[in-house]
A protein has these predicted regions:
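Structural/interface elements that position substrates and couple domains in central-metabolism enzymes
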Residues: 1-273
């Protein structure tokens, strides 16, 4: 159940008792019932999602620094996330945020601020940094591919997160076209079986399972954090002697690839390979 139920109404005396009765089952479980004006409810929604987007963007920028300094971003996330004033949620370094809410709501909040001539520079910089994130990830993949002479790239997952078929503003939609422009062969496996959005790219191959993808690639990109991607025995599945992995979700620990022929790259952590 949610932490709170926010009701936006300009007639709270009439509406509040009705809706409080409707939401009573989850209120009894601890959800807070908040009644505000319609404008306030809208701003609560935008501000909440902008704040979460800011946390994601912050840890992604810290991950950039960690990669240059040889520090493990997971240690940083744990160190600051255990502070109850901050909290550990949304402090996982990875691709740019996407989906149906964060991109839309941050932009709506920025547009609203412009309409009222208020400069929300923080929110605008979050939007800008998140857009740059897609370019940075694409360049990271291209650099690894060039260094290791890799041509066949396979994406494990293309949705913006696990347990959904939602492709809206998924970082894969920004990264894959950049890879195609560099004459790399792209394939992908998506647990939902979704093909619709990427089907317009005739050069992209859809694989029916993770095994087909891994056996036909020399460079695997772990893009979405599906549970089925968390315990793959890459040595067993792939016979490729120069297999490289770029784990955009940090699903594996770098130590798992010590003394193995696989080159393992992740986000904001030391390289092992």
């Amino acid at each position: 159940y949610p932490d709170r139920v926010v009701i936006g109404t300009n007639n709270s005396k009439k509406i509040s008792p009705i809706l409080k009765k409707l939401y009573d089952p989850i209120i009894k479980k601890g959800a807070k019932f908040i009644v505000v004006s319609r404008k306030a409810a809208e701003l609560i929604k935008y501000a909440a999602n902008a704040f979460l987007a800011t946390k994601i963007t912050f840890i992604n920028e810290i991950a950039n620094l960690c990669e240059k300094t040889g520090i493990n971003v997971d240690d940083i996330a744990e160190g600051i996330g255990t502070d109850q004033r901050i909290g550990s949620r949304f402090l996982r370094a990875g691709p740019a945020y996407g989906g149906s809410c964060f991109p839309k709501d941050t932009k709506a909040l920025a547009k609203t601020s412009d309409d009222f001539k208020v400069n929300l520079s923080l929110v605008k910089n979050v939007i800008r940094s998140n857009g740059n994130r897609n370019n940075l990830i694409a360049q990271k993949i291209l650099k690894i591919a060039k260094q290791n002479h890799l041509k066949k790239i396979g994406f494990l997952g293309v949705t913006f997160k696990a347990n959904t078929d939602d492709m809206r503003d998924s970082s894969s939609l920004f990264i894959i076209p950049k890879l195609l422009k560099n004459n790399l062969k792209i394939s992908y496996y998506e647990p939902t079986g979704s093909k619709s959005v990427l089907s317009k790219y005739k050069k992209i191959k859809y694989c029916i399972n993770q095994k087909e993808l891994i056996t036909n690639c020399d460079f695997v990109i772990i893009h979405s954090d599906w549970d089925e991607f968390k315990n793959i025995d890459f040595n067993k599945v792939s016979k490729n002697k120069k297999l490289s992995i770029c784990d955009l979700r940090n699903l594996y620990h770098p130590d798992e690839f010590k003394n193995k022929k696989i080159k393992y790259y992740s986000i904001g952590r030391p390289f092992h390979g």
